[in-house]
């Protein structure tokens, strides 16, 4: 179907986000919407930033994109670390560019904080490597309980939320740099500009079965071979990429002879289901998301109808 600019009569074009758990069909719905209402797609899956991580992230091939431009795919090498702040800048640039051509930007993905960074009012405090090194040294010479007491005096909210040393140091770094609690920089549920979020959810048991089939399909499509090739390019050194679902598990098969591909696949299924539950918790906590059943045969039409009432 040919894309028609502003086909739902909203002017200027609004930002649309298709959100939800992995495996719910977000990519297919975003393609249908882009074709029907006139849009281009912006990736909001942090693991699809990585070049070469294709099968295990369910990244659409060029043919599967059906001629619709996709932004912010393949932006990082596997050893690079993803940055929410950098993504915010890139996503907002892409949004502005798409809207300037009379089309709707359609963000699609399940990386909740990245989506919030693109859509909502969210500040990122600066960093000071020298200050961070000093704080890390102080922590090494002290103990975490004393550091927690120190943070509690200036930011009790963050102290209660933070469970690891890295974020504890970061919270104190931000306070010393800005004089503001780290918790004051947390995202507010306030859109930067008019936005409509469509969430996909539905039968949990059905989703679990779908995720299992998806992992087995990825293995059959060559996920183990993809991981082996990326290992030669330094996948194990990538702090973010090496933790991706499927990639973490199949990397183990290369270093642990007793850890089989079959076990890696089963562990990937378990980890993917756990991740999906966390995504559902994240997105259902946002009252602005308008939900649809991912299994509905009328999904594109229902989504378009919702948008027409915006």
Curated annotation (Swiss-Prot):
Keyword ATP-binding: yes
Catalytic activity entry: adenosine(37) in tRNA + dimethylallyl diphosphate = N(6)-dimethylallyladenosine(37) in tRNA + diphosphate
Region (Interaction with substrate tRNA): 45-48
An annotated GO BP: tRNA modification
GO MF, one annotated term: tRNA dimethylallyltransferase activity
Binding site for ATP: 20-27
Residues of the site described as Interaction with substrate tRNA: 111, 132
Keywords carried by this UniProt record: ATP-binding, Magnesium, Nucleotide-binding, Transferase, tRNA processing
Top-level enzyme category: transferase
InterPro entries referenced in this protein's UniProt entry, alphabetically: Dimethylallyltransferase, IPT, P-loop_NTPase
Binding site for substrate: 22-27
EC nos: 2.5.1.75
Cofactor(s) demanded: Mg(2+)
Pfam families (UniProt xref): IPPT
Keyword set includes tRNA processing: yes
PANTHER family per the UniProt record, alphabetical: TRNA DIMETHYLALLYLTRANSFERASE (PTHR11088:SF60)
Protein family according to the UniProt entry: Belongs to the IPP transferase family.
Role, per record: Catalyzes the transfer of a dimethylallyl group onto the adenine at position 37 in tRNAs that read codons beginning with uridine, leading to the formation of N6-(dimethylallyl)adenosine (i(6)A).
Name of the molecule in the record: tRNA dimethylallyltransferase
Protein's organism: Renibacterium salmoninarum (strain ATCC 33209 / DSM 20767 / JCM 11484 / NBRC 15589 / NCIMB 2235)
């Amino acid at each position: 179907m040919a894309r028609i600019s502003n086909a739902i009569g909203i002017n200027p074009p609004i930002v649309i986000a298709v959100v939800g758990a992995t495996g719910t069909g977000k990519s297919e719905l975003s393609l249908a919407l882009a074709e029907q209402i006139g849009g281009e797609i912006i990736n909001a899956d942090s693991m699809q930033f990585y070049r070469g991580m294709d099968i295990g992230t369910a990244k659409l091939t060029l043919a599967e994109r059906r001629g619709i431009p996709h932004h912010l795919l393949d932006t990082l090498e596997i050893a690079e670390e993803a940055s929410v702040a950098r993504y915010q800048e890139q996503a907002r640039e892409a949004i502005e560019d798409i809207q300037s051509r009379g089309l709707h930007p359609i963000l699609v993905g399940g990386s909740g904080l990245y989506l919030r960074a693109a859509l909502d009012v969210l500040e990122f405090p600066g960093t000071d490597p020298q200050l961070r090194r000093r704080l890390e040294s102080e922590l090494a010479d002290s103990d975490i309980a004393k550091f927690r007491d120190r943070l509690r005096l200036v930011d009790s909210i963050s102290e209660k939320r933070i469970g690891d040393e890295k974020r504890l140091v970061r919270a104190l770094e931000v306070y010393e740099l800005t004089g503001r609690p780290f918790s004051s920089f947390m995202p507010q549920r306030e859109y930067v500009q008019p936005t409509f979020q469509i969430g996909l959810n539905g039968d949990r048991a059905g989703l679990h079965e779908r995720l299992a089939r998806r992992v087995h399909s990825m293995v059959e499509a060559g996920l183990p071979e993809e991981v082996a090739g990326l290992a030669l390019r330094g996948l194990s050194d990538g702090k973010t990429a090496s933790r991706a679902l499927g990639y973490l598990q199949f990397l183990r098969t290369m270093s642990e002879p007793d850890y089989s591909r079959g076990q890696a696949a089963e562990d990937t299924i378990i980890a993917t289901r756990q991740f999906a539950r966390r995504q559902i918790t994240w997105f259902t906590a946002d009252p602005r998301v308008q939900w649809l059943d991912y299994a509905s045969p009328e999904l594109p039409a229902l989504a378009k109808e919702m948008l027409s009432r915006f």
